Amino acid sequence: ILAELGLEPATHSTQIVEPEFMADFVHALISTFGVLANLADDMRHLQRTEIAEVAEEFAAEQVGSSTMPHKRNPWNFENVKSMWKAFTPRMQTIYADQICEHQRDLSNSASQRFIPEILVALVSVTLRLNRIMSRLVTDAERMRANLALTEGMVTAEPAYILLAAYGHPDAHEAVRRITLEAERTGRPLGEVLFASAELRPWLERFTPQQREIVLNPARYTGIAAQKARGVCAVWEKRLGLA
């Protein structure tokens, strides 16, 4: 059976197998649970009214709230987080089971019977997330609107990096002052930046692509999309999904 599971027998044991093997295994389960709960919590917050960039798909007759007919609560994502909160504390019990008096008492005989529930819970939330994420509704227009809220402030980072790369002696401070001016006047950061006579000697060296990144925050993505696809490809191959 061990061979079929890709496992090896312990190098030594008493009347019991060393409990550290189980502790490491369950820790991996709980750690995975945390990753899924973090994803669920991110999606849950992105569904809030003031953000509203994503949403769980709702059927025509589905009820989102028992008291507010208009609501579409992210109840599936909330379920995943709730399950994580319920099962994460069980890791403490697993650690406690490492202590076995004289390597053979029965103080873990009851507590270890609940370990399969952790596996069942993890499989359950995985299936739930697979189902919900495959039907996730995204709002690109809302994403663009949220990005525009700060009038391009996010491009302060590439602006100061480029200025420094072209030799400005204190690019961070220079851009910090530009952001203050942009906030005071309500003008986009890129507009204020490229209107600066003080910074013109360095700004003139920007390539068209670099200027576009500073003027258009939506272009400031680097290789994020490429990396995301790469990570997905790696795990699809490892999990036999490719």
What is each of the regions a protein language model found here?
Residues 68-242:
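Glycine-rich cofactor/substrate-binding loops
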Residues 1-97:
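Internal glycine-rich alpha/beta core junctions
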